Amino acid sequence: MLVYQDLLSGDELPSDSFSYTELGNGVLWEVQGKWVVQGAVDVNIGANPSAEGADEDEGVDDQAIKVVDIVDTFRLQEQPSFDKKQFVAYMKKYIKNLTPKLGAEQEEVFKNNIQGATKYLLSKLSDLQFFVGESMADDTGMVFAYYKDGATDPTFLYLAHGLKEVKC
């Protein structure tokens, strides 16, 4: 299995168990998330249900909750929304911190395409949710989520050049 770590914080963000689509010349990865129910346990011991009162809830609280698979799997932490000025400031700082960590070829592709990716994200700014990895480091890569028109499951956007592939 391949896991992709944030180059700046080392947090695990996506893995190859979630397929992605490249956007903006490979600068952004789009990954489809899903709402899943977690914690619901239905125990069937195979006994006679009518004798045991199968229709009765005997005070069992299984605390089933709905979570987004990607957020839960990688322990992403939601952050407050950004306005346009804050977002542009974040992107400038991110580019400044990430560029020295890239190889020459990767740096060239990143610099040539990050402006288009930033404009794309700015166009969706009011619809985006912002997440960071579990370390919640200050200068880290962000994961962006939004809902496509009519979708019930969120779509996540990753800045691909800020990810390092690690085999598990």
From Swiss-Prot:
Gene Ontology cellular component terms for the protein in this record: cytoplasm
Segments forming domain TCTP: 1-168
Keywords attached to this entry: Calcium, Cytoplasm
Main location: cytoplasm
PROSITE patterns associated with the record: TCTP_1, TCTP_2, TCTP_3
Induction: Expression is highly induced in the dark.
An example molecular function term from Gene Ontology annotations: calcium ion binding
Keyword Cytoplasm set for record: yes
InterPro entries referenced in this protein's UniProt entry, alphabetically: Mss4-like_sf, Mss4/transl-control_tumour, TCTP, Translation_control_tumour_CS, Translational_control_tumour_p
Domain of life of the source: Eukaryota
Reported function: Involved in calcium binding and microtubule stabilization.
Protein name: Translationally-controlled tumor protein homolog
